[in-house]
Amino acid sequence: NQKYINVPKIRRRRFKVVLDCVNGAGAYSMPLLLKRLGCEVIEMNCERTGIFPRLPEPIPENLKATMQSVKKHKTDIGIVVDPDVDRLVLITEKGEPFGEENTITQAVKFYLSKKKGNTVVNLSTTRAVDDVASEYNCKVFRSAVGEANVVEKMKGVKAVIGGEGSGGVILPKIVFGRDALTGTAIMLQHLLEFGGKM
């Protein structure tokens, strides 16, 4: 939603990014998105083979080479997606995992700062989301674990944003499903507005 994502400003910032798509579906769309946002992209595991070069779960123990690459290339951020591009994992400029729970929390913070409304997360997502929502006098509703449950609840309470602590961001204005491309655009805009460091 370009109302909240300032594409020209992101392009001017020229973020330097390590991108790891585990040779999954993201290898088609993620490099294209980042390049259109003016990022300098260092691609890792972005071959369109569907053959995973490492264990595909985007957890720190599987991302050691990606974290080292962020440090080596002195990038602003590392962006990792899972094979079907619904989960987003970020790596700080220091080469440290940002934490999937932090991703959903910061995405909610950014979006509620632009558009107030209800948020839905699952029962296992961090309570930090509630703290962020309360800053904007917004309500958080909880659903059972699972994307379908979160989406159903979002529709029921007309939520403006939702997701899960696993790094899945759901923005109904874009799609009623977890979407790492949407999460990436939100997080780059968030970085831009809050100083460029995580």
Describe the role of every protein-language-model region:
Residues N1-F194:
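Phosphate-binding chemistry for phosphorylated carbohydrates and sugar-nucleotides
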Residues G196-M198:
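Mid-to-C-terminal polyanion-binding domains and interfaces
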